[in-house]
A protein has these predicted regions:
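A short, N-terminal "cap"/entry segment at the start of jelly-roll beta-barrel domains
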Residues: 1-63, 155-228, 232, 334-376
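Activation on folded, globular domain regions of eukaryotic proteins
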Residues: 21, 30-31, 68-70, 139, ...
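Conserved short histidine dyad/triad with adjacent acidic residue
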Residues: 48-55, 66-83, 215, 232-247
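Conserved metal-binding segment of the jelly-roll/cupin
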Residues: 73-74, 109-131, 141-144, 274-296, ...
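A short beta-strand-loop-beta hairpin characteristic of the jelly-roll/cupin
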Residues: 77, 81-113, 246, 250-278, ...
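A short hydrophobic beta-strand segment most commonly corresponding to one strand
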Residues: 88-90, 118, 133-153, 252-254, ...
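Eukaryotic modular interaction domains in large regulatory/scaffold proteins
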Residues: 219-220, 229-233, 239, 251, ...
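C-terminal flanking tails of non-heme Fe-dependent oxygenases
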Residues: 266, 270-273, 295, 300-376
């Protein structure tokens, strides 16, 4: 008769299954609120993937999303790999090729620094470094922690022969979206957004619209066909900052360029300030207020990678807002005056003047004049 202690089925465990899987890896696993530069993060060999890698468990991911950094050696091609989930890749350094394969069909596209693309679930893919003199470094985003909580078998997710693609990326419309994103405008109260499988340069992306209600920033919203993830590209003019706001967990923020500062804090508790630049990354914890400031001489931009919409949070298009939160945003008229003073002090150190309109601190209904985009 089998002893109770010998049973192999999954039972409740105080440590999440994803965390226990991390303990089996021989690569670094960082637990941080903020990483100053993903481009210089120490990696280690990952024999299974034949590359150097590390996983960053940000405090704000809270079992929702995964952030992984990998490095492709100079001139190398990583072995084919199939992942059960969609995975999203941002290029921190380098240029190369990505090939997505299903049987005899394949799609290859070129990527470069600041490119962003999706590796669709159920397909084999190969990643190649086109540079022979330096490594390429990538940031990967997926929702493995969340799904592994439901399917607590790591082998299910990696090179699983029983998993087949559930959407055809080789149909003419999908293939076209690897070449050029398309704008979608559904009219009504929904704002226009861009749909594609591949975005060549998020640092240079200039198709923006006003981000009304958040201050003077403009933004682009990027979507991926057949998936629930979206990406926001808020862009702040020189000498400005956004309103403090809060939302749910798992939204990874990475900086493509510029110089700035962010602050995060749980309501009623001490504020944590971080100075950022290209390669910095962080994740605001659930229900923590956070606020972003441009301290540089050029417009400041950050990339916000949102987990699947409609599944975790309320709000339209996965805004990750809580329906029961009466104060999801702090108006400039209500913010702690010390925040404004710190912003202006930081600008002074850099010889930059604040361009925040004095009226926005007096009138909560103040309407910004947007120079970075239009509603059209």
């Amino acid at each position: 008769m089998q002893n109770q202690s010998d049973k192999t089925y999954e039972v409740w465990h105080p440590v999440p299954r994803y965390d226990r899987w991390l303990e089996t890896l021989d690569i670094p696993v960082y637990h941080e609120y903020f990483v100053g530069d993903l481009r210089t993060l120490r990696l280690a060999p990952w024999e299974e993937r034949e590359c150097n890698a590390a996983i960053v468990v940000f405090a704000g991911q809270e079992g929702v999303s995964e952030a992984r950094v990998s490095e492709i050696p100079a001139g190398a091609t990583l072995p084919p790999f199939k992942f059960t989930l969609d995975e999203y890749v941002y290029v921190l350094e380098g240029r190369g090729l990505a090939t997505v394969v299903a049987g005899r069909r394949q799609k290859t596209f070129e990527w470069q620094k600041h490119s962003f693309f999706v590796l669709p679930r159920g397909y084999h893919h190969r990643l190649s470094n086109a540079q022979g003199n330096r490594a390429a470094r990538l940031l990967h985003f997926n929702c493995l922690p969340l799904v592994m909580a439901v399917i607590p078998n790591p082998a299910f997710f990696f090179n699983n022969p029983s998993i087949e693609p559930d959407r055809d990326i080789f149909d003419p419309e999908s293939e076209e979206l690897f070449s050029e994103a398309k704008q979608v405008d559904e009219g009504g109260k929904r704002e226009a957004y861009w749909v594609g499988n591949f975005f060549p340069d998020l640092r240079a992306w200039d198709k923006l619209r006003p981000q009304r209600g958040r201050g003077g920033a403009s933004v682009a919203t990027l979507m991926f066909p057949g998936t629930g993830v979206r990406v926001g590209l808020p862009t702040m003019p020189v000498g400005t900052y956004k309103k403090a706001h809060r939302h749910g967990a798992g939204i990874v923020i990475v900086i493509p360029g510029g110089e700035g500062m962010s602050v995060m804090w749980p309501e009623g508790q001490e504020k944590q300030f971080f100075n950022w630049h290209e390669g910095s990354a962080f994740v605001p914890p659930s229900r923590w207020y956070h606020q972003h400031f441009n301290l540089g001489p050029v417009p400041g931009r950050y990339i916000a990678i949102f987990p699947p919409r409609h599944q975790l949070f309320g709000g339209t298009r996965g805004e990750a807002k809580f329906q029961d939160d009466p104060h999801p945003q702090i108006e400039y008229t209500e913010e702690d005056p010390a925040v404004r003073r710190r912003f202006e002090d930081e600008l002074r150190k850099r010889g930059i003047e604040s361009r925040m309109p004095p009226e926005c601190y007096r009138d909560p209904r103040y309407e910004w004049a947007y120079a970075g985009g239009s509603d059209d």
